Amino acid sequence: MTSFVNFQSRCDRLQHYEVRYPSHAIIKAVFVPSGSAETVGASHPKAMIMDSYNFMTPINENQTLYFWFQLRNFSPGDAALSKVMDDGVRAAFAEDRRVLAAVHEGFKNQATQSLDLATDRAPLTFRKQLARMIAAENSGP
């Protein structure tokens, strides 16, 4: 596939992850000409931005609806690019669903204590905060 960036140099990629409790994730990917990420970032006139939004809505203890969409600020009328990106995003989110389902099964049938790795700090922090929120909700007013 041809590169979709609108500049000739290598690029810097900025990634922003945000979680909104209990179940929203927002990911912003910014591509700018190499060397400009620290000075102008997303405000660069040639910045190419892709935003992804994930929404998980529990139905019950074992079922969750998973919605997502992605936006971009470049080539809005390019149907071929839209298809390539849509296919890629669908494949990525389908993979996420399989992983999330496997993680859920693992937690449901957990026989040993979790191994907390430093690289897992963000999801561990998320789970701990969510557990505190659930406990507070279940404890009543």
Predicted regions and their residues:
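C-terminal catalytic domain of Rieske-type non-heme iron oxygenases
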Residues: 1-141
